[in-house]
Amino acid sequence: MPKRIVYNISSDFQLKSLLGEGAYGVVCSATHKPTGEIVAIKKIEPFDKPLFALRTLREIKILKHFKHENIITIFNIQRPDSFENFNEVYIIQELMQTDLHRVISTQMLSDDHIQYFIYQTLRAVKVLHGSNVIHRDLKPSNLLINSNCDLKVCDFGLARIIDESAADNSEPTGQQSGMTEYVATRWYRAPEVMLTSAKYSRAMDVWSCGCILAELFLRRPIFPGRDYRHQLLLIFGIIGTPHSDNDLRCIESPRAREYIKSLPMYPAAPLEKMFPRVNPKGIDLLQRMLVFDPAKRITAKEALEHPYLQTYHDPNDEPEGEPIPPSFFEFDHYKEALTTKDLKKLIWNEIFS
């Protein structure tokens, strides 16, 4: 028997059906009785674990900031009655009927559909990157789709702000052991993220987009690794094992470089044989996304300009985004010291600001 889901929400809403559930929240559709509009309401119980609260705080801040056609829109966040009884967060957002994971697994997609879905994904990533935001968890289930095939990126709980003035962008020192958060799905994780402790850059999102594009072509994940080693073997089995010092210079850790050298030496696989019925322009874009060296990987802006997406590309309708300062996620710099009550206060302030 399914468990009963309780929503403590305004009487203005009538719950309809369960849309999905994850580790720390559920999403239901609901009717807004005064207007008749059908919305999605995400219920989060963030105070069981500090990591859940941090993810919720990032999600709220990001979604309040962005107003973009390919990023999920929030209409409102229900205001709790009192701080003492504040145990749940209710985010009211636009209703999307499904997600890309479900679409891929249930139907064949035309090349035009594939172009449109990856175009919209990259259009969102371009504005995020122009705003100094890295999503860090792009995957088909985080790309919501409606009946018009409109696509919206969701789930910003692992997002980070890039500090352009910093020598590198990694988790603040000492925070990689205790409150480690990088739990993004391994299958979409860039090789440099797997091989280097906690650094991150815009290029890691582009790798994830490449994995998504390949999955649109194959109708299954391209790198479904069972574990860390298997994941790298699958990646190198397709892009080739990097072996020269020039290939490996993007990996700073000597230990990681030695580990790569210990792996089997695979040549790059010819993608046109792997994808015999795929538009050659699509294969060319994929090859530019799945590049080992993040500095040589195509950017989201460049990908939008690629011939594969020329049907949809419009330079006047692909916003760049305004840079967000690192202070936007200031709490990430001292998150180890934050108590649950501290995080509760930060989320409370964000809801009421």
Curated annotation (Swiss-Prot):
Q: Which residues carry this modification: Phosphotyrosine?
A: 182
Q: Which domain of life is it from?
A: Eukaryota
Biological-process GO terms, alphabetical? cell division; intracellular signal transduction; invasive growth in response to glucose limitation; negative regulation of MAPK cascade; pheromone response MAPK cascade; pheromone-dependent signal transduction involved in conjugation with cellular fusion; positive regulation of protein export from nucleus; response to pheromone triggering conjugation with cellular fusion
Its EC number is 2.7.11.24
Question: PTM comment for this protein?
Answer: Dually phosphorylated on Thr-180 and Tyr-182 by STE7 in response to pheromone induction, which activates the enzyme. Activated FUS3 initiates a feedback signal, down-regulating phosphorylation of both, FUS3 and KSS1.
Q: Which Gene3D superfamilies match?
A: Phosphorylase Kinase, domain 1 (3.30.200.20), Transferase(Phosphotransferase) domain 1 (1.10.510.10)
- Enumerate the active-site residues: 137
* Residues annotated for ATP binding in this entry: 19-27, 42
Disulfides per UniProt? none
Q: Which keywords label this protein?
A: ATP-binding, Cell cycle, Cell division, Conjugation, Cytoplasm, Isopeptide bond, Kinase, Mitosis, Nucleotide-binding, Nucleus, Periplasm, Phosphoprotein, Serine/threonine-protein kinase, Transferase, Ubl conjugation
Q: Cofactors per UniProt?
A: Mg(2+)
Protein kinase domain location is: 13-309
What name does this protein carry? Mitogen-activated protein kinase FUS3
Organism of origin: Saccharomyces cerevisiae (strain ATCC 204508 / S288c) (Baker's yeast)
